[in-house]
UniProtKB/Swiss-Prot annotation:
Record-stated family: Belongs to the class-II aminoacyl-tRNA synthetase family.
Protein name per UniProt: Histidine--tRNA ligase
Organism from which the protein derives: Archaeoglobus fulgidus (strain ATCC 49558 / DSM 4304 / JCM 9628 / NBRC 100126 / VC-16)
InterPro entries assigned: aa-tRNA-synth_II, aa-tRNA-synth_II/BPL/LPL, Anticodon-bd, Anticodon-bd_dom_sf, His-tRNA-ligase, HisRS-like_core, HisRS/HisZ, HisRS_anticodon
GO biological process, one term: histidyl-tRNA aminoacylation
Pfam family, one: HGTP_anticodon
PANTHER family listed in its UniProt record: HISTIDINE--TRNA LIGASE, MITOCHONDRIAL-RELATED, HISTIDYL-TRNA SYNTHETASE
Keywords (A to Z) from UniProt: Aminoacyl-tRNA synthetase, ATP-binding, Cytoplasm, Ligase, Nucleotide-binding, Protein biosynthesis
Database matches in CDD domains: HisRS-like_core, HisRS_anticodon
Major location category of this protein: cytoplasm
Protein localization: Cytoplasm
Entry's EC annotation: 6.1.1.21
Reactions accelerated catalytically: tRNA(His) + L-histidine + ATP = L-histidyl-tRNA(His) + AMP + diphosphate + H(+)
Length: 409
């Protein structure tokens, strides 16, 4: 009986892997051009790292297990917490800000559907040590540039969780956190019900829903000032800078985060054509270091859903020029020697390892889409020459071995 792959996982064949590597390469190059350096953390961590950040409820969505000593471990469901754990363990005394990026697989036990898998990849950055609007601007500009460079058609929405949190102060932290979770889920009915349950007065209720409706250009800040007495300077400065550098965005004061460690600016990117799973990037400012035993350290960052970007973007893998070195029986060592020379010059060269005759070697090369075949026969080997055949045009020339490289360029 065949063994199938686990539900919610995928196999990637060479064509798809080459495309994914091209997209990944572009993301890495852009992040590095902003001064970000790659970090990596373990595939599994102590379970407490994620429950301390997100609460016990997240366990239902995680792959959790005990090691042989009975310690509770989990496959990482995301990468911000591991990177911040690494910061507290290894980097907290380094000069700030720190600019890190990562690319890795994550695991969540969710119902598989289009755009949502149990094993998935994230590309993300963390800018650690600044609470300035300039830090928020940098990571938003970086996310915007990455998505544009790989050809995703998307919209960018920016909010600020501090505004709603300030409005909710009268109901206390625990109740405010539940309200934020309901807003984050988009559960308006549940929100209405909960506000009634905790007897929020009509004035505060109206202000909450009025704030949630504010979406548009910078004029929404002026409207928000009519609803709440709050210092909007950070958001105003950020908006002005982003406009100055040509980033297109919409302010959406209805964006929330259900997790208390988000502190200020938040943003989301939505791609066209992905249906319900259209969010391809999410980020914002947060403070996690102190939760993990480190110093209070303001940070900001984002994570890109790499699989969704692959589905939404227009990048194709670059064509590789593959050369097949084919030979008559008894000339295998010469074929391996010529192939090695080609590889040293930067070509991709393949030789027959099946013991096929010349005709079958040529047929296989054509089936594989190879453009050129370098043919070694007894006469060519004796005279230090090779035959080069263009398998697309069927043209063939015989040249001195040293001329081979210039013809294949």
């Amino acid at each position: 009986m065949k063994i199938e792959r686990p539900r919610g996982t995928r196999d990637f064949l060479p064509d798809e892997m080459e495309r994914r590597r091209e997209i990944e390469k572009r993301m890495r190059k852009i992040a590095e051009s902003f001064g970000y350096r790659e970090v990596a953390t373990p595939t599994f961590e102590y379970l407490e790292l994620f429950t301390r950040k997100s609460g016990e409820g997240i366990i239902e969505e995680m792959y959790v297990f005990k090691d042989k000593s009975g310690r509770d471990l989990a496959l990482r469901p995301e990468l911000t917490a591991p990177v911040m754990r690494m910061f507290v363990n290894e980097c907290s005394v380094m000069p700030k800000p720190l600019r890190f990026y990562y690319f890795a697989n994550c695991f969540r036990y969710e119902r598989p559907q289009k755009g949502r898998y149990r094993e998935f990849w994230q590309f993300g950055v963390e800018l650690i040590g600044s609470e300035s609007y300039l830090a928020d601007a940098e990571v938003i500009i970086l996310a915007d540039k990455i998505l544009k460079d790989v050809g995703v058609n998307f919209s960018l929405e920016i909010g600020h969780v501090g505004i709603m949190r300030h409005l909710l102060k009268p109901i206390g932290e625990d109740r405010a956190s539940k309200v934020m979770r309901l807003i984050d889920k988009g559960d308006r009915e549940g929100l209405e019900s909960y506000l009634a349950e905790i007897r929020v007065n009509e004035d505060l209720r109206d202000k909450i829903f009025s704030l949630l409706e504010l979406k548009g250009d910078e004029s929404v800040i002026e409207e928000a000032k009519e609803i709440i007495d709050y210092d909007f300077g950070h958001l105003e400065s950020l908006s002005a800078l982003l406009r100055d550098v040509g980033v297109d965005f919409t302010l959406n004061l209805g964006i929330a985060r259900g997790l208390d460690y988000y502190t200020g600016v938040v943003f989301e990117c939505y791609a066209e054509g992905l249906g319900a799973q259209k969010q391809v990037c999410g980020g914002g400012s947060y403070e996690l270091s102190s939760l993990f035993g480190g110093p209070v350290t303001p940070s900001t960052g984002f994570a890109i859903g790499f699989d969704r970007v692959c589905e939404a973007c227009s990048v194709e893998a670059g064509e590789k020029s593959v050369v097949a070195v084919v030979s008559f029986k008894g000339l295998e060592s010469q074929a391996f020697r010529v192939a090695s020379m080609l590889r040293e010059r930067g070509f991709t060269a393949v030789v027959d390892v099946m013991g096929r005759n010349l005709k079958k070697q040529m047929s296989f090369a054509s089936e594989m889409g190879v453009k050129y075949a370098v043919i070694l026969g007894p006469d060519e080997v004796k005279s230090g020459r090779v035959a080069i055949k263009n398998l697309e045009t069927q043209e063939q020339v015989v040249v001195a071995e040293e001329e081979l490289f210039s013809i294949l360029q």
